Structures are given as structure tokens and as C-alpha cells.
Amino acid sequence: GSPAWADAIRMLVQSSPLAGSQYYAVGRVWPELKPGDRLELVREADNRHDRHAVRVDWRGQPLGYVPRAENRAVARALDAGERLEGRVSRLRDDPDPWRRVEFDILLVL
């Protein structure tokens, strides 16, 4: 049969720019990144800069973070055991790192 995740309903929670990407692997993986790619949201409760930190990974590589101004509800949902995932929604070859990668956060029902 088809994998279980294929049958799941996904509800859009928010769309965000990728924060902090200039410090991570985005430049290295840029040629491989595509709109629609799945992103893993990793809770970093022990992050000393932001206790609501949610890291964004692509194929096991950290790309950046959910922006601090937009991460509180996402952190709470992950802490509560909700299934959230990210998807690349837009890629722009822009010198401003905040404009290069946009992604959607989806609640898996």
C-alpha cells in the first residue's frame, strides 16, 4: 500500500522566511534545494539564545531557524507532541539571506 504519511491531512500553520541561514549549509546545498522539499523542524529547548528555538533541517543538515518573532506557537506545538513539518515554498537567489528561502509550517493531522 501507499505510505501512511501520504494519506495524512496537512494544515498550513504559517509561512516564514528562514532565519540564520547565512551561518548554515544553505550555500552548500542551494543547487539541490527545491520548492516542495520536506524540512524537519527540530526543537532546541536548551538553546541559550532563544528558549523557543526551532531549527530547520533539510536531509539531516541544519539550514537555519524559524524566525524568533514567529517561533513561540511552533515551539509550544512541538513541546505538546504535535506533528509539524516544514516545506520549502519559495527560493530566491537574493543577496539578502532573509529573502533566499521561504518555507511553510504544516500541522500533520
Q: Where do the PLM segments sit?
A:
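Conserved active-site motif detector
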Residues: 1-109
